Amino acid sequence: MVLTEQKRKYMEKLSDENGIISALAFDQRGALKRLMAQYQEAEPTVEQMEDLKVLVAEELTPYASSMLLDPEYGLPATKALDKNAGLLLAYEKTGYDTSSTKRLPDCLDVWSAKRIKEQGSDAVKFLLYYDVDSSDELNQQKQAYIERVGSECVAEDIPFFLEILAYDEKIADAGSAEYAKVKPRKVIEAMKVFSDSRFNIDVLKVEVPVNVKYVEGFGDGEVIHTRGEAAAFFKQQDEATNLPYIYLSAGVAAKLFQETLIFAHESGANFNGVLCGRATWAGSVKEYIEQGEEAARQWLRTTGYQNIEELNQVLKQTATSWKERV
């Protein structure tokens, strides 16, 4: 991470007074459509998606250090942020081509780092699916793509947050026991690759290195990792990068995510915050679709507020300042 004066200002806007990134993620597009479609027969509309993002921004950004949105449905919400909250905008197209296992990255057609900056964003976020065991040809293609995004961000003097979602080309179900066995290596090795300074990444947004459902004492099903083994993976993950890194919530329940962060800290992971999405706001979708805006607001002011406040308390005890990694 090369910290220019301009980037320092952006990073301080994105983090709290202790240098911890307690960011709210709502750049979901395809996932949000699918969530909304569970509660109504009609296809979710652009207006519905925009409105819910605005509601979440209005109600929850007073309690977050920043918010991640997308330029497709999230622009109205960028105007609804609390004045102290920073803004990140997603640069990638949502989803991936399911007809292939390659999961190639793709930028939004009419966006650039320059345009994201002009929109008032404090950072560019890009999501990459990466399997360290894919062919060198495919992974070189992905690495070159990230180099381009990194160079754009350097040119615009804006922080670059890379979100890495590890996967296995041969295992379709990421929630399976089969994938849980290989996940630690997939996540940790991908972090090592993108910690190279050639990519010009400022912050890594990463998964926790284990599927906690399969860790002794966390789930009530099959145990794949003992607590000791899981703790060692968190420690290895911390040692895999010299960059600031933050955890994504991966759609798990709020309580489980909080317990995971405590375990990460106890295991020696010096992570620098979170970008937490569905674990905070998911319950508001049902209220919004079935009861309307006021019911969604009520949910956000009660359960949503409780989720984010509890998370903030956990972060105070567990996360460290990104400045310690600069």
From Swiss-Prot:
Q: Which InterPro entries match?
A: Aldolase_TIM, DeoC/FbaB/LacD_aldolase, LacD_aldolase, Tag_1.6-dipho_adolase
Question: Which reaction equation describes what this protein catalyses?
Answer: D-tagatofuranose 1,6-bisphosphate = D-glyceraldehyde 3-phosphate + dihydroxyacetone phosphate
Its EC number(s) = 4.1.2.40
Q: Which SMART domains match?
A: DeoC (SM01133)
Q: Name one GO molecular function term.
A: tagatose-bisphosphate aldolase activity
One GO biological process term: lactose catabolic process via tagatose-6-phosphate
The record's annotation in HAMAP family points to:
LacD
Q: What is this protein called?
A: Tagatose 1,6-diphosphate aldolase 2
Gene for this chain: lacD2
